[in-house]
């Protein structure tokens, strides 16, 4: 492996949406940083069977519904 071309690989704390915390190694941030997740396997519709409501991040879902909601498809 070539020296000085790879990003720093260090330990960070990840906090899931339910408050569960765990330590992992990552190239994100710097040593000891905390990553707070907005969506994780316990809240993502792909893993929960779509039973939870979809987050409207930045109004994209609302914009889509306003534009195409009255097509009646």
From Swiss-Prot:
InterPro entries attached to this UniProt entry: Ribosomal_bL28/bL31-like_sf, Ribosomal_bL31, Ribosomal_bL31_A, Ribosomal_bL31_sf
GO BP, sorted A to Z: translation
Record keywords, A-Z: Ribonucleoprotein, Ribosomal protein, RNA-binding, rRNA-binding
Keyword Ribosomal protein included in the entry's annotation: yes
A GO molecular-function annotation: rRNA binding
One GO CC annotation: ribosome
Functional note: Binds the 23S rRNA.
Quaternary structure and interacting proteins, as annotated: Part of the 50S ribosomal subunit.
Protein name per Swiss-Prot or TrEMBL: Large ribosomal subunit protein bL31
């Amino acid at each position: 492996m070539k020296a000085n071309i790879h990003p720093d690989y260090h330990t960070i704390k990840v906090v899931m949406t339910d408050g569960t915390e765990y330590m992992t190694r990552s190239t994100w941030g710097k040593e000891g940083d905390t990553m707070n997740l907005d969506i994780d396997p316990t809240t993502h519709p792909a893993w929960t069977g779509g039973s939870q409501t979809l987050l409207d991040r930045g109004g994209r879902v609302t914009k889509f519904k306003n534009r195409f909601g009255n097509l009646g498809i």
